Amino acid sequence: MTPEEEAHFRVLQAIAREPDITQRELAEQLGLSLGKTNFLINALLEKGAIKMESFRRSDTKLKKIAYLLTPSGISERVRLAQGYLIRKRLEYENLKAEIDALERDSIVASIQSGESKV
């Protein structure tokens, strides 16, 4: 999964959870700049993965925008999720192996120094 695909996946995930999220809220949630978030939204709109709908909230007179996943956006999200899961599982296994090695080294060092921290 490329960094761009991961960014698209994270945007699609956020929109699926909260369609009426603003770009500013999305940027904060994903830790991205507002400009980068706008770029990602526009790329997903161009790909046909999402569409925009405007509506009025009953408690205000302001128009709001909702981002909705299209059928191709849902398929894209599923495809990207599979790659994301594979990568995250691999990262988890590597991290777990590193933690296990550090714990073994720590136990060996404790035994060698005469401490018993087990």
Where are these regions (language model features)?
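Key DNA-contact positions within bacterial/archaeal DNA-binding proteins
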Residues: 24, 35
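Amphipathic alpha-helical dimerization/coiled-coil segments
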Residues: 75-118
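Alpha-helical residues within the helix-turn-helix
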Residues: 28, 45-46
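Pre-recognition alpha-helix immediately N-terminal to the DNA-recognition helix
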Residues: 9-13
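Short, cationic-aromatic polyanion-contact patches
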Residues: 1-8, 22, 55-78
